[in-house]
């Protein structure tokens, strides 16, 4: 590119920024949008590009006119822009003159052009400010500035007049460049002489398919605009602005992956040789993404470095027919363990500190900061784009060839009818799905073994499907299944559980039991334990046998394990109500309201203890088919001896001392000495008469005594009666 163009770079950059301020304000935007439609550029980015191009009047440099000439013309254009609006036709004529002028400029930028270009650019930057406002005016009144520009007597300016199309100041700037470009031949010649930016122009022109014609319909000749956009890319002054436009184009239909390396030497090797290799499972994911997306960008980071090392585009799927580079590998990994060689096009080899990315959180990795992720972690596209925009521009890398590849890929995808579908990776976290070697966590594959064996599928809507017990139990109506918690997604949610269902973070206690009967019982106990002290006394809750399970719909029968007939409960005597006994009971005194202890305060009892208290009030010999849990092993509460002792205590009526012994322990320890509980329960119960043989109520008294405290406090069941 001519030296003048380089000199102009600074002022042009300023102008480009000014133009950017006004981006997308005018009607031209719509025109641009139409032009760019085929282009696959974002209208906004295109407009910005064209603006950028305009701002660097040197866009002509794109058209291979020396940037100086174009900048001169551009500056004169800007100055004369309002008049320059003349008519698109003059622009066309000027195009031919432009092309010749451009060629001339290319051949021999006169010192005047060089210096003048510089000066003009500066003035342009000054004028541009006004131009931006003027531009809008121009858009409205496309006065024939072209004539004025022509008076400037520079053919490049004449080209600019073709910009008459420019409606907005920035757009007019762009269109100036475009006007210069408008003659496609000019563009081509420009592209030959001009930097790779011209390549961009070609792309756009090709995309436009004779953008000139198309451009003309737009208030500015869109094609010129595109050209100018491309030209803007060429002109260094526009370059800073154009870089973002190019990135925006590159981020279309793109997937982003985090690549973590244990060794900075490997990343340096990759930057030098433009290849990478990763583990086979990541290899497969990247290859799949390469088939489905227009671009696959890899964002590199070295572990413990505190920064990103740059980002690159996959140029091809991994190949095993290429020899591996001499990577620096830990002794535990053989080079043969790696996948194929992935060819890369580096877009930025510069580093970016993690501190600059703290505001970005990857929603595809449970909302963790984007810097956190394992090797091969996919980044949500919007966040990936934001992250890549934070990298400084790498001036040593020419983006145009990469953009051409991207455009070609897009064309192939269009022909094949492939549409990029953005969906989070199957394994939302490393604990997720057993697949892909990504550590199927606690609940990977065993579907039939019982609680928490759900195979996790993350394709559906919210991240947890309604909890459905695998034994045909309709347990909690709509929800309650929780993923194992991550600190970033703490409340898996007992959202759909019955009112007041357990809201604790751990897996619900009823999920721990293998049989549905045990699970149902545990569910009830959990419900009681959690709601104790938070609800007014509830109506009588019969023993588990008659209890309709919440959400079961059909009552108890609906919740029974598949093999158990509902009739098995008919053999049990109806529960004894305390008011069936002699005399009217005194009003129970309710426990003072208490703050529920923090979740996890009272860990669920062991399976044996749970079974023991559960069966305490049932007949000594359970009906056929009823699950037998603890036998008399746990203190004999459900054995004949335990029941006899309890009944004797209740009937004797005098065991006040015993009454305190069990309850006095309070807290979780209270129910652990089950013998004391059973014995003492009768002592407390004498007031009510021998209502359920002592055992029945001891069954209920256990879970609540743990919260209760002193022996004087009645059990939950006593309170409610």
UniProtKB/Swiss-Prot annotation:
Residue spans of biased composition, Low complexity class: 48-75
InterPro entries xrefs: YTH_domain, YTH_prot
Keyword Nucleus: yes
Record: residues binding RNA: 260-262, 276, 327
Amino acid composition bias (Basic and acidic residues), ranges on this chain: 135-151, 699-708
Region annotation (Disordered) ranges: 29-239, 424-471, 580-605, 651-721
Biased composition (Basic residues): 451-471
The entry's keywords: Differentiation, mRNA processing, mRNA splicing, Nucleus, Sexual differentiation
Domain YTH, first and last residues per copy: 254-391
GO BP, sorted A to Z: cell differentiation; mRNA splicing, via spliceosome; regulation of alternative mRNA splicing, via spliceosome; sex determination; sex differentiation
Role of this protein: Regulator of alternative splicing that specifically recognizes and binds N6-methyladenosine (m6A)-containing RNAs. Acts by acting as a reader of m6A methylation. Required for sex determination and dosage compensation via Sxl alternative splicing: m6A methylation acts as a key regulator of Sxl pre-mRNA and promotes female-specific alternative splicing of Sxl, which determines female physiognomy. M6A methylation is also required for neuronal functions.
Protein name, per record: YTH domain-containing protein 1
Domain of life: Eukaryota
Observed phenotype of the null mutant: Mutant flies survive until adulthood but exhibit flight defects and poor locomotion. Flies display sexual transformations dues to Sxl splicing defects.
Composition bias type Gly residues, residue spans: 432-443, 651-670
GO molecular function: mRNA binding; N6-methyladenosine-containing RNA reader activity; pre-mRNA binding
GO CC annotation, single: nucleoplasm
């Amino acid at each position: 590119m001519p030296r003048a163009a380089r000199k102009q770079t600074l002022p042009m950059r300023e102008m480009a920024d000014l133009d950017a301020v006004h981006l997308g304000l005018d009607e031209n935007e719509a025109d641009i949008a139409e032009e760019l439609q085929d282009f696959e550029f974002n209208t906004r980015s295109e407009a910005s590009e064209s603006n950028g191009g305009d701002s660097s009047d040197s866009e002509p440099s794109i058209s291979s006119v020396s940037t100086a000439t174009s900048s001169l013309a551009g500056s004169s254009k800007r100055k004369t822009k309002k008049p320059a609006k003349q008519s698109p036709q003059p622009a066309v004529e000027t195009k031919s003159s432009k092309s010749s002028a451009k060629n001339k400029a290319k051949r021999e930028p006169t010192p005047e052009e060089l210096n003048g270009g510089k000066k003009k650019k500066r003035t342009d930057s000054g004028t541009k400010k006004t131009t931006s406002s003027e531009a809008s005016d121009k858009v409205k009144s496309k006065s024939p500035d072209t004539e004025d520009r022509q008076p400037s007597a520079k053919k490049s300016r004449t080209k600019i007049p073709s910009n008459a199309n420019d409606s907005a100041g920035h757009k007019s700037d762009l269109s100036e460049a475009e006007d210069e470009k408008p003659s496609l031949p000019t563009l081509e010649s420009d592209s030959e002489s001009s930097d790779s930016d011209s390549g961009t122009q070609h792309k756009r022109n090709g995309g436009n398919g004779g953008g000139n014609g198309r451009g003309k319909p737009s208030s500015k000749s869109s094609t010129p605009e595109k050209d100018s956009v491309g030209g803007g890319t060429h002109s260094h002054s526009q370059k800073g602005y154009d870089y973002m436009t190019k990135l925006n184009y590159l981020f279309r239909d793109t997937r982003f992956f985090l690549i973590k390396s244990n060794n900075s030497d490997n990343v340096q090797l990759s930057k030098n040789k433009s290849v990478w290799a990763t583990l086979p499972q990541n290899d497969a994911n990247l290859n799949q993404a390469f088939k489905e997306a227009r671009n696959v960008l890899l964002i590199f980071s070295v572990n413990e470095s505190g920064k990103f090392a740059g980002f690159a585009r996959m140029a091809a799927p991994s190949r095993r027919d290429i020899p591996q580079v001499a990577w620096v590998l830990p002794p535990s990994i053989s080079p043969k363990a790696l996948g194929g060689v992935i060819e890369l096009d580096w877009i930025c080899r510069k580093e970016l500190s993690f501190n600059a990315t703290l505001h970005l959180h990857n929603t595809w990795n449970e909302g963790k900061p984007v810097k956190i992720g394992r090797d091969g972690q996919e980044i949500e596209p919007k966040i990936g784009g934001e992250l890549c925009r934070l990298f400084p521009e790498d001036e040593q890398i020419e983006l145009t060839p990469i953009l051409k590849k991207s455009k070609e890929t897009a064309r192939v995808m269009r022909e094949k009818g492939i549409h990029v579908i953005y969906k989070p990776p199957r394994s939302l976290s490393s604990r997720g799905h057993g697949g892909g070697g990504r550590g199927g966590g606690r609940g990977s594959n065993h579907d039939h073994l019982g609680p928490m064996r759900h195979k996790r599928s993350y394709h559906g809507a919210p991240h947890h499907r309604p909890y459905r017990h695998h034994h045909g139990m309709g347990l909690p109506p709509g929800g309650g299944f929780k993923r194992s918690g991550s600190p970033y997604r703490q409340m898996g949610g007992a959202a759909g559980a019955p009112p007041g269902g357990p809201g604790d973070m751990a897996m619900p206690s009823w999920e721990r039991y293998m049989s549905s009967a045990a699970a149902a019982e545990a569910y009830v106990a959990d419900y009681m334990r959690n709601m104790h002290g938070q609800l007014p006394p509830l109506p009588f809750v019969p023993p588990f046998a008659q209890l309709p399970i919440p959400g079961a719909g059909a009552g108890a029968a609906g919740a029974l394990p598949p093999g158990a007939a509902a009739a098995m409960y008919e053999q049990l005597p109806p529960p004894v109500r305390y008011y069936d006994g002699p005399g009217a009971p005194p009003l129970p005194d309710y426990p003072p309201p208490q703050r529920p202890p923090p979740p996890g305060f009272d860990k669920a009892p062991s399976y044996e203890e749970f079974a023991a208290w559960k069966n305490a009030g049932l007949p000594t010999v359970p009906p056929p088919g009823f699950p037998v849990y603890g036998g008399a092993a746990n203190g004999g509460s459900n054995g004949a001896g335990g029941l006899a002792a309890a009944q004797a205590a209740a009937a004797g009526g005098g065991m006040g001392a015993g009454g305190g012994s069990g309850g006095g322990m309070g807290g979780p320890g209270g129910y652990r000495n089950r013998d004391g509980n059973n014995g003492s329960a009768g002592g407390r119960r004498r007031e009510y008469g021998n209502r359920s043989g002592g055992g029945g109520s001891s069954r209920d008294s256990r879970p609540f005594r743990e919260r209760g405290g002193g022996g004087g406090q009645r059990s939950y069941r006593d309170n409610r009666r």
